[in-house]
């Protein structure tokens, strides 16, 4: 994104800025953790790469106020997974797209957790009918069988890379690519995206029906949910351990939230069984 800003947009060298958001999680490289709003991810890894501005997630007005000629890109998760399945206000991504167009800024969407059917769409940004300039994907791209990641972007962005200036030792690994293609074939042929869209409302309704003084709120979209506990519950991790012993695998995140991400092949009866355990 910065190279695009210098070579295409004409931002003065060394002055490009990328807008990012509180509660973000984009990985664990030094540059990425440098703009995390979580101290535990940053501790012991500085000094960090400059040129990132941290803004409140879900607040499009804050993005509008942060715009200036040297902004290169907006990097955003359409739904924040690591923060506990935080869904932004309706229209948020559409407003970011409008602001990006208005100021000639790239809109880059991180779909590493939310993409490839998880929310009931191929990509979560489709819920708002937008088209980003760049999309990052991984995790489900190989169905959990092999490490593979990719970036999808418009030609104007990809063409700033010429042979020899950027790459990685195992980039284009043929085994990873073969596994990725097979996983995408399964996603389409077995209609797993449609399954997530069909079963998502059932999962949401069952979660909202939980009546417990320990539950602060539930949030879900497609087959992806967060159950946020009240502070008095003493944190989500001990409940995740207890649920594991009873046959339900889930993950704690941000201390108080139980995160559920069932496989897209799950059935309605299996959802019911899991929620009975919960």
Residue ranges and their predicted role:
Residues 1-278:
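Conserved N-terminal phosphate-binding loop of PLP-dependent enzymes in the Aspartate aminotransferase
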């Amino acid at each position: 994104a910065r190279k695009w800003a210098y070579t295409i947009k004409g931002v003065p060298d060394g002055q490009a800025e990328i807008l990012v958001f509180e509660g973000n999680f984009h990985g664990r490289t030094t540059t990425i953790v440098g703009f995390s709003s979580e101290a535990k991810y940053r501790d012991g890894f500085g000094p960090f790469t400059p040129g990132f501005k941290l803004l409140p997630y879900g607040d499009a007005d804050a993005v509008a106020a942060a715009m200036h000629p040297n902004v290169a890109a907006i990097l955003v998760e359409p739904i924040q997974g690591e923060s506990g399945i935080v869904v932004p206000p309706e229209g948020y991504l559409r407003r970011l797209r409008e602001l990006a167009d208005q100021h000639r800024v790239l809109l880059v969407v991180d779909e590493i957790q939310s993409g490839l059917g998880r929310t009931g769409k191929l990509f979560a940004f489709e819920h708002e009918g937008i088209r980003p300039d760049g999309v990052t994907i991984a995790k489900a791209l190989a169905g959990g069988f092999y490490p593979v990641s990719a970036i999808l972007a418009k030609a104007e962005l990809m063409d700033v890379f010429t042979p020899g200036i950027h790459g990685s030792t195992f980039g284009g690994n043929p085994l990873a690519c073969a596994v990725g293609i097979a996983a995408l074939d399964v996603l389409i042929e077995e209609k797993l995206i449609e399954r997530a869209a069909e079963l998502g409302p059932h999962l949401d309704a069952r979660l909202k029906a939980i009546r417990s003084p320990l539950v602060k709120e539930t949030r879900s979209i497609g087959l992806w949910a967060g159950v946020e506990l009240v502070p008095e519950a003493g944190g989500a991790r001990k409940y995740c351990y207890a649920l594991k012993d009873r046959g339900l695998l889930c993950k704690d995140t941000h201390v108080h939230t139980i995160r559920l991400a069932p496989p897209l092949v799950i059935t309605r009866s299996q959802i019911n069984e899991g929620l009975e355990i919960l």
